[in-house]
Amino acid sequence: MAKGLDCGTGNYVACLSDKVKTQRNAFITIDQSMNTKKSLKRLNIPYVEINNKLHVIGKAAFEYAQVFGNVALRRPMADGLLNPKERDALPVLRSIIYELLGEPETPGERVIYCVPGTPIDKDTMVDYHESVLQSLIDGLGYSSRAINEAEALAYTGLVDNNLTGIAISFGAGMCNVGIFYGGMTAKAFSVSRGGDF
């Protein structure tokens, strides 16, 4: 059975055979102590440990940042792509992806993941972003393949129109646009402004 993964700036969403799981794409850093670690484990709060610091990930990070106020909510992605200013982005993303996908049901199980189109208003490295995500997913024992986000939307939203029309995704980091005719992509691109702008 294959799985789907939408890798968004605001949320990561996994489509599994029996359910859809969502995790906020954010984290906070807290000091490590035995009591803190035990509390996180007891409350089943996802975290990753990097350089003697605990990074609480996902929805729990957002909630803690709201409650404590003086804790900075950080994001491993910005403007629809990997955040180049966030050095802990990769281990955090690996944890978010693992929490959503879990272990493969069979070795090399297929995961299709979304990537943005090339921005028309900014010079960015979409290929690098795609390669890093593939490495993170494949590193968990999956066999992954990228799909343009607008194309993925077209496969669900344009089915009744013979896959002909326009698909637009308004994400937190960018907007993805695709123009399709009879299932073929006439044009696909992104604009590097989204809901966080």
Segments (PLM) and residue ranges:
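Glycine-rich SAM-binding Motif I of class I
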Residues: G173
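Nucleotide/phosphate-binding catalytic cleft detector across ATP-hydrolyzing
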Residues: M1-F170, Y181-F197
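A structural feature that tracks compact, well-ordered secondary-structure segments
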Residues: N176-G178
